[in-house]
């Protein structure tokens, strides 16, 4: 008996899709946004909602993520809502639909791949369905699918899988219809790469991934490879361009990434350990890992610090060598490994990204389960098809069970964040999240005790220092001494982006009408302490933020002259008409009309000096807004 005895791969695929939807269903009820969701989606409401071309252009082409801004991904968020604040439950079903589409495209592409390998049709169908079902039902994909902003990674993967499938379809046509074949391959590669890149930059890997496929495909007289010239232009050239780009990023100088707590060698050492952890989670799945609190991950400071660094690096080299060796004897094993490595090339190598994120496996793991499917095929041929069916079914059910339990955990934000915090005792962000939850629950004594313990454990962490002060400001219990102590610590602590956000939160709360008057002066002193911090200069945006926050505080203190000076200094640092106009509106609202007109002139100057491509709206729209604001200010001034 062979796999031909059982002829229901399409039914199994349909069951896998239905099972995936059922497993993810609890997670769709989680009505909360996480981390990077808000910075990327709050722009929906900046202009009163996306309701016309100007607001559409501003949102879709004004993205802040990556070099491209990822406009295609941003455009899809408009399928779910066109304003902000919004409801997370409106976005998550779209993410799940994309996940299912990715699984179906992966299945189609894998089937076409196996046909290129000249597998028998029945076996190819079973292998394609099983391996793609493993990917579709794997619990590691939950943190990509239910984390709304990771739609960017999903869409990029979707177009990569589509491009691969179209390319492999065209490749099958080469012997009999070469013109159609090259049309399919060229269009699929070009369009797939373009759409994927404008979803997320990982899409640039498509030519390299197809080179990996070509490398692992055996030479077959009846299945000719694409012409050398075509491969050179369409596959080798873009792949080499990507590799050259990465090579140009190599810089082992200390302090190359001022916003990171590691340098480039330390990142590479750490990634060697992290990639093995990814592989462990993929082949030994668990319900929930460390989540998004990875700031406590132990950075490798050398080949033997920690000692696992060198074995991890040597192990990856050995795995890569084994894949090259296995290319002819076990090509699917070689393909799975090399595809995985190629998929991690951008995000797990020399670029200054954060160290660890599960979503980096969403694309990379696409072909990783093919060797497992081939193992089941061996069982079916050597023993009985029923045995292979039972083993494969049990594996898929286990994956589905873990995914369902993980989706249950993702249903409740507090439950999820508390779990992550318990799993990451070395993460300052985890402590900060638990304190926020306890504060919302009005468990203030527990929150204060936890913060005190966290500040003792992480004395150099500016975010936790500012959070402790913020807790006292919330309760209107902060004294001048509290501000002084926080400032003394802040002047020598390691400064980072979470600390910048914490400072803005402090100013927002200090400016509320029921706060003690001395809070404003004390906060100005705190900002000055921050400016004395030696790591402060690493963050150019914080200089403009600092001036802006000072302007707000002086304006609230009824010191319009100094407020005007700080606002205008901030505008010069921003060099952007958008925040400039926002500041003009704030100044005018405080009835400092002379300052508002002076600042409006600076906003006009910023507009004149700004390139069209950097504008979030059309130049005409800004010019009309400046005229409108000037008229309003003049009218108010004359009353």
Residue ranges with predicted function:
Residues 418-639:
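C-terminal luminal/periplasmic domains and tails of membrane-associated envelope-modifying transferases
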Residues 2-472, 476-480, 484-497:
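Polytopic membrane enzymes that build or remodel cell-surface glycoconjugates and lipids
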């Amino acid at each position: 008996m062979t796999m031909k005895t059982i002829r229901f791969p399409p039914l199994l695929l349909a069951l896998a899709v239905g099972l995936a939807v059922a497993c993810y269903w609890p997670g769709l009820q989680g009505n909360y946004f996480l981390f990077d969701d808000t910075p990327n989606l709050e722009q929906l409401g900046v202009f009163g909602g996306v309701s016309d071309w100007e607001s559409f252009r501003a949102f879709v082409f004004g993205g802040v993520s990556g070099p491209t801004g990822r406009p295609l991904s941003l455009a899809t968020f408009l399928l779910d809502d066109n304003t902000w604040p919004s409801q997370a439950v409106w976005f998550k079903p779209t993410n799940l639909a994309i996940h299912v589409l990715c699984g179906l495209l992966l299945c189609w592409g894998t089937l076409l791949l196996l046909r290129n390998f000249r597998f028998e049709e029945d076996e190819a169908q079973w292998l394609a369905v099983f391996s793609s079902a493993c990917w579709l039902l794997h619990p590691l994909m939950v943190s990509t699918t239910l984390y709304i902003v990771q739609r960017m990674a999903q869409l990029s993967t979707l177009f990569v899988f589509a491009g691969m499938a179209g390319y492999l379809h065209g490749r099958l046509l080469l012997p009999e219809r070469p013109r159609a074949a090259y049309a399919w391959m060229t269009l699929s590669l070009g369009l797939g790469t373009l759409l994927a890149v404008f979803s997320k930059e990982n899409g640039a890997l498509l030519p390299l991934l197809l080179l990996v496929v070509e490398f692992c495909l055996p030479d077959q007289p009846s299945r000719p490879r694409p012409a050398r010239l075509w491969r050179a232009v369409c596959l080798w050239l873009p792949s080499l361009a990507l590799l050259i780009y990465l090579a140009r990023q190599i810089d082992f100088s200390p302090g190359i990434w001022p916003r990171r707590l590691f340098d480039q060698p330390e990142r590479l050492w750490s990634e060697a350990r992290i990639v093995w952890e990814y592989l462990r989670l993929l082949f030994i799945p668990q319900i929930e890992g460390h989540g998004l609190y990875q700031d406590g991950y132990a950075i490798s400071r050398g080949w033997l610090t920690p000692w696992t660094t060198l074995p991890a690096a040597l192990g990856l080299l050995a795995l890569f060598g084994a894949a090259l060796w296995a290319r002819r004897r076990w090509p699917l094993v070689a393909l799975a490994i090399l595809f995985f490595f190629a998929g991690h090339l951008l995000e797990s190598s020399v670029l200054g990204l954060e160290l660890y994120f599960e979503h980096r496996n969403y694309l990379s793991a696409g072909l990783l389960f093919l060797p497992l499917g081939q193992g089941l095929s061996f069982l079916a041929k050597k023993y009985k098809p029923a045995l292979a069916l039972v083993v494969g079914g049990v594996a898929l059910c286990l994956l589905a069970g873990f995914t369902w339990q993980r989706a249950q955990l993702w249903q409740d934000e507090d439950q999820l964040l508390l779990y992550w915090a318990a799993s990451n005792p070395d993460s300052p962000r985890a402590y900060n999240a638990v304190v926020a939850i306890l504060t919302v629950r009005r468990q203030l004594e527990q929150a204060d005790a936890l913060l005190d313990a966290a500040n003792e454990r992480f004395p150099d962490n500016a975010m936790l220092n500012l959070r402790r002060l913020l807790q006292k400001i919330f309760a209107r219990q902060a004294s001048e001494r509290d501000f002084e102590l926080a400032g003394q610590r802040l002047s020598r602590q390691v400064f980072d982006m979470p600390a910048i956000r914490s400072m803005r939160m402090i100013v927002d709360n200090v400016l509320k009408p029921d706060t003690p008057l001395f809070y404003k002066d004390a906060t100005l002193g705190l900002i000055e302490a921050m400016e004395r911090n030696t790591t402060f200069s690493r963050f150019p945006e914080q200089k403009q933020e600092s001036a802006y926050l000072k302007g707000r505080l002086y304006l609230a203190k009824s010191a319009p002259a100094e407020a005007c000076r700080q606002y205008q200094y901030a505008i010069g640092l921003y060099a952007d008409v958008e925040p400039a106009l926002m500041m003009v509106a704030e100044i005018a609202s405080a009835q400092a009309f002379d300052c508002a007109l002076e600042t409006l002139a600076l906003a006009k100057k910023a507009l004149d000096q700004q390139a069209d491509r950097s504008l979030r709206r059309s130049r005409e729209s800004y010019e009309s807004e400046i005229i409108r604001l000037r008229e309003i200010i003049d009218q108010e001034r004359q009353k």
